[in-house]
Each structure stands twice: as structure tokens, then as C-alpha cells.
């Protein structure tokens, strides 16, 4: 089930649970996973997009192998908060994904996540080639960590 409001997504999840975070792009899908208590996000891999069936099969393999209970997609809003074509593509991917899994699917505002990931990789003195290889799943971990922190705040209030 797709939850447009982040609070609804958080409420649909068990208290302590592992999530997968996705940075959905035109050519790749960055994948990050959280630990089982939903505290720390870790970059996992970048899927080179081919067809939805192949992409979703790889995601479902990751989910099955890690006891994941929710899917979080970064929503690439414009800087003014409006939604453009990339948001529409992300929402379409979420709709298609909801047809192959019963897990709750939520969205997190991903504005500037790739910029933050790029900056962190530069500070770590990562080579240009290596940055290109890991940027998407590092960005996915930034997206997922932001959502995990927000969930912790919601649940402590």
C-alpha cells in the first residue's frame, strides 16, 4: 500500500523494523537498507535500470534476504516544493511496485540528498570514478537516514 503522507507510512510500520530506501533515477536505482531496529541506514548497491520486471525482481530479492518491512522512495521535488516529471516517474514506479509487494511504500523529500552525498564523498577524498559508482546508493542512504531520524522523532513525541 502506498502512503503519500510520511506520518501514515510511519504508522503502518512495526515499532522496530528494517526498511529499504531507494533513490530512483532515470538510469539507476540507489539502494540502502536500515538495521533491524530502524536506526542506521547503510548504502547497499546501485541497480542499473533495465525493465521494471528485472528491477523489481532484484529489489524483491534484497527485501526477502534482509527481513525488510517497508519501502521508502526518495521524492525528487523541485526546490519550490512542487512536483515535476521526476516525481511523476517516482510515483509511477511506486504504483508498479505496489502491484508486486504488499509492503507499505512511503515517500521522503529527497531535495539535495545527492548534493549531500557528493559532498561527503568529496570530503572522504573519493576518486571521481568511485564517486560515480557509489553516488546513487550513498544518496539512498541519506534519504533513508533522514526518514529514520524523523520516524524516531515522531515516535518519541
From Swiss-Prot:
Gene3D superfamilies: YqgF/RNase H-like domain. GO terms for biological process: rRNA 5'-end processing. Its EC number is 3.1.-.-. GO terms for molecular function: nuclease activity. Signal peptide: none annotated. It is found in: Cytoplasm. GO terms for cellular component: cytosol. Keywords: Cytoplasm, Hydrolase, Nuclease, Ribosome biogenesis. It is an enzyme of class 3 (hydrolase). The keyword Cytoplasm applies. InterPro entries: RNaseH-like_sf, YqgF, YqgF/RNaseH-like_dom, YqgF/RNaseH-like_dom_sf. Pfam families: RuvX. Could be a nuclease involved in processing of the 5'-end of pre-16S rRNA. NCBIfam families: RNAse_H_YqgF. Belongs to the YqgF nuclease family. This is Putative pre-16S rRNA nuclease. It comes from Ruegeria sp. (strain TM1040) (Silicibacter sp.).
Amino acid at each position: 500500500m502506498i502512503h503519500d503522507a510520511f506520518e501514515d507510512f510511519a504508522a503502518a510500520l512495526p515499532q522496530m523494523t528494517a526498511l529499504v530506501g531507494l533513490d530512483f533515477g532515470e538510469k539507476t536505482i540507489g539502494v540502502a537498507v536500515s538495521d533491524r531496529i530502524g536506526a542506521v541506514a547503510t548504502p547497499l548497491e546501485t541497480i542499473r535500470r533495465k525493465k521494471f520486471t528485472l528491477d523489481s525482481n532484484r529489489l524483491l530479492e534484497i527485501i526477502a534476504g534482509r527481513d525488510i518491512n517497508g519501502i521508502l522512495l526518495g521524492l525528487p521535488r523541485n526546490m519550490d516544493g512542487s512536483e515535476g516529471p521526476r516525481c511523476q516517474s517516482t510515483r509511477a514506479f511506486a504504483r508498479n511496485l505496489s502491484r508486486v509487494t504488499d509492503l507499505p511504500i512511503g515517500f521522503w523529500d529527497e531535495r539535495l540528498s545527492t548534493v549531500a552525498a557528493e559532498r561527503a564523498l568529496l570530503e572522504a577524498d573519493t576518486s571521481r570514478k568511485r564517486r560515480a559508482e557509489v553516488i546513487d546508493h550513498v544518496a539512498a542512504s541519506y534519504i533513508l537516514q533522514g526518514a529514520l531520524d524523523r520516524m524516531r522523532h515522531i515516535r518519541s513525541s
